[in-house]
Amino acid sequence: MSFRAILLAAAASLSLVTAAAAQPIPSTADVAKQRVFANIGLLNSECIRYDAANDRYLISNLGARGLENNGYIAVMSPDGVIVNQKFIEGGRNGATLIDPLGIFIENGLIYVADSTHLRKFDLLTGAPRGEVALPGAGRPNDLFATKDGTVYLSDNGGLSGTIIKVSPTNQVSLLQPRDDIMEKPNGVAVLADGSIVHGGRGVNISYRDASGNLLREKTMPSGMFDAIVPLADSSLLIASQGGRNVYKMTAKGDVSEVAKEITVPGAIGYDSKRNRLLIPQTTAASITFVDLP
């Protein structure tokens, strides 16, 4: 084969690979149907979670940037109205909220990743219910609490990241030593089989066993992940800041897009009663509703 023929064959092969890589993923996203709620009293709104027991949404707000104790958690109704702007407020009623990022609802508690602590509040009253210092933590971000009271927090601060584990007796350990291979994890969740799934600055969604051993990875169309939300059918909702969208990935690994043109999707939530995706944006201080098909 001549050199020219080799070049042409290589170019053709590269074109096929590029074309395959460029194939669009299935999408049900419709920007016209994405309802945005802005200018509603939020300030640096990072995370939203559905409180199924009380049919309401809880939203963490960093408040003014800095180390002041001025973060807060707002309550939104399912029709998009803020019914209690500062249900829990740093500096009031004994609450400390300096830089509240991820929140999670379980066991009648609101768990909050805040600065170098895991904080707990009563779900009904908002009263403080304890806190756990996280020695060596850089920036605890997202979190997931299991029914037995174990909490997993992503830490993407510092030069490398990890997953912090807090036992039901408040013992703190690392699921995996700090290492670049963790890709500075942000979104973290625990699946029905007990495995831990996380995603961070890269394009891989990683699965680990309870001892931190890597089980497998799934490469996504885009990365820079925020929250990961497991659904009842074992699929996952995954926020991608790199793609400015939200993916749904089935248990078999099939990926589709369910929301798009979200400038910086934060720690998403899911309303199981309405089959609704909830998307916060921190800087925009907004919430987007996406009713899923």
Where does each model-flagged region fall?
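Bacterial N-terminal signal peptides
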Residues: 9-15
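Blade/loop signatures of beta-propeller domains
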Residues: 23-32, 71
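Asp-box/WD-like beta-propeller blade repeats and closely related beta-sheet repeat scaffolds
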Residues: 32, 117-148
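A short beta-strand motif characteristic of beta-propeller blades
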Residues: 32-39, 82-94, 127-133, 171-179, ...
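Beta-rich, blade/repeat-based domains predominating
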Residues: 41-54, 70, 90-109, 135-154, ...
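Short loop/turn segments immediately following the C-termini of beta-strands
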Residues: 62-64, 115, 156-158, 200-202, ...
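A short loop-to-beta-strand structural motif that recurs across blades of beta-propeller domains
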Residues: 69-74, 117-119, 161-164, 204-206, ...
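Short loop/turn segments that connect beta-strands within beta-propeller blades
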Residues: 76-81, 122-127, 166-171, 209-213, ...
